[in-house]
Curated annotation (Swiss-Prot):
Function of the molecule: Catalyzes the conversion of the cyclic tetrahydrodipicolinate (THDP) into the acyclic N-succinyl-L-2-amino-6-oxopimelate using succinyl-CoA.
InterPro entries in the record: DapD_actinobacteria (IPR019875), Hexapep (IPR001451), THDPS_M (IPR032784), THDPS_M_sf (IPR038361), Trimer_LpxA-like_sf (IPR011004), Type2_DapD (IPR026586)
Primary location class: cytoplasm
Any GO CC annotation of this UniProt entry: cytoplasm
UniProt-annotated binding residues for Mg(2+) 2: E180
Pathway: Amino-acid biosynthesis; L-lysine biosynthesis via DAP pathway; LL-2,6-diaminopimelate from (S)-tetrahydrodipicolinate (succinylase route): step 1/3
Residues holding Mg(2+) 1: D163
Species of provenance: Mycolicibacterium smegmatis (strain ATCC 700084 / mc(2)155)
Family: Belongs to the type 2 tetrahydrodipicolinate N-succinyltransferase family.
Stated name of the protein: 2,3,4,5-tetrahydropyridine-2,6-dicarboxylate N-succinyltransferase
Binding site residues for succinyl-CoA: R198, G213, S216, A239, E254, A255, G262, K274, R287, R288, N289, S290
Length: 314
């Protein structure tokens, strides 16, 4: 059983909707009974107290809260609980799939994310008009998840485009996410990695792997699927390739080749099998025969790719 807790700032609308909760220093420990309690007076840390209060322009109130989770294996109890679990992932206190995230979409609100903070979707044009006296209003998106870097900035990583990494992503030290890379929540890297493609929800990429430009990895949200896809150590997904099975260590998927679970692949001995039967195997090269068009899989000798150390000295 793993417990977690955190003191944070919640943005709440006039009708009680929780837009966000920021936990600057979450912990893997319990500091009281499970649930969320609003803090007042001396219970509010001094560095957070000055940030609380009403924001009339956004029609919200920022309040201090303490959220405690007795067991991360249990489903989230409320919106604050979900936000704490997402922070734990991006703070690298938990790895993808170590905390139960069942039902989170029903607990999170759709939010207008702006340079002045989160705003309610309903009536936003009126809110925008009030905010304009502060300056230009930039809308980063309308979504249930914000950009990770607006809440957590993990050490030892590079993120070329902040819009491409959602809160709840787990980026290990040494990870570089280039402009076209994308990392969803409850997904990410476990070691030094180059990310120029898409790491979908639930996908885990191990140390030393390279997700090439435009490459796509199917996630647990794809078509309502439940398959959790893992990419092992020192693997390469070539540019514009795709992956719907897990890879062991030292594997390569040729550029432009999409390997789904049902893809028929021809082995070195001429046998034809579904790619799912090879899920999790190591030292494999998936390629397309340029003459016949057939997808082939052959054994690879030695270790896989080697990343450029200079690109990951973050």
């Amino acid at each position: 059983m793993t417990a977690a807790s955190g003191i944070g700032l919640a943005t709440i609308t006039a009708d009680g909707t929780v837009l966000d909760t920021w936990f600057p220093a979450p912990e893997l420990s319990a500091s009281g009974p499970a649930g969320t309690a609003r803090l007042t007076g001396d219970d509010v840390p001094a560095d957070l107290a000055a940030l609380t209060g009403k924001d009339e322009d956004r029609d919200v109130e920022v309040v201090a809260v303490r959220t405690t989770i007795a067991d991360l294996n249990d489903k989230p109890a409320d919106t604050h609980d979900v936000w704490l679990r997402l922070h734990l992932l991006s703070h690298r206190l938990t790895k993808p799939h170590e905390a139960n995230l069942d039902g989170i979409f029903g607990l999170l609100s759709n939010v207008v994310w702006t340079n002045f903070g989160p705003c309610a979707v309903e009536g936003f044009e009126t809110t925008r008009a009030r905010l304009r006296k502060r300056g230009a209003v930039a809308v980063y998106g309308i979504d249930k998840f914000p950009r990770m870097v607006d809440y957590v900035t993990p050490s030892g990583v590079r993120i070329a485009d902040a819009d491409r990494v959602r809160l709840g992503a787990h980026l290990a030290s040494g990870t570089t996410v280039m402009h076209e890379g994308f990392v969803n929540f409850n997904a990410g890297t476990l070691g030094t990695s180059m990310v120029e493609g898409r790491i979908s929800a639930g996908v885990v990429v191990d140390d030393g792997s390279d997700i090439g430009g435009g490459a796509s990895i199917m996630g647990t949200l794809s078509g309502g699927g439940k398959e959790v896809i893992k990419v092992g150590k020192r693997c390469l997904l070539g540019a514009n390739s795709g992956l719907g099975i897990s890879l062991g260590d030292d594997c390569v998927v040729e550029a432009g080749l999409y390997v789904t679970g049902g893809t028929k692949v021809t082995t070195a001995d001429g046998q034809v099998t579904k790619a799912i039967e090879l899920s999790g195997a190591s030292n494999l090269l998936f390629r397309r025969n340029s003459l016949s068009g057939a997808v082939e899989v052959v054994k690879r000798d030695g270790t896989g790719i080697t990343l450029n150390e200079a690109l990951h000295a973050n």
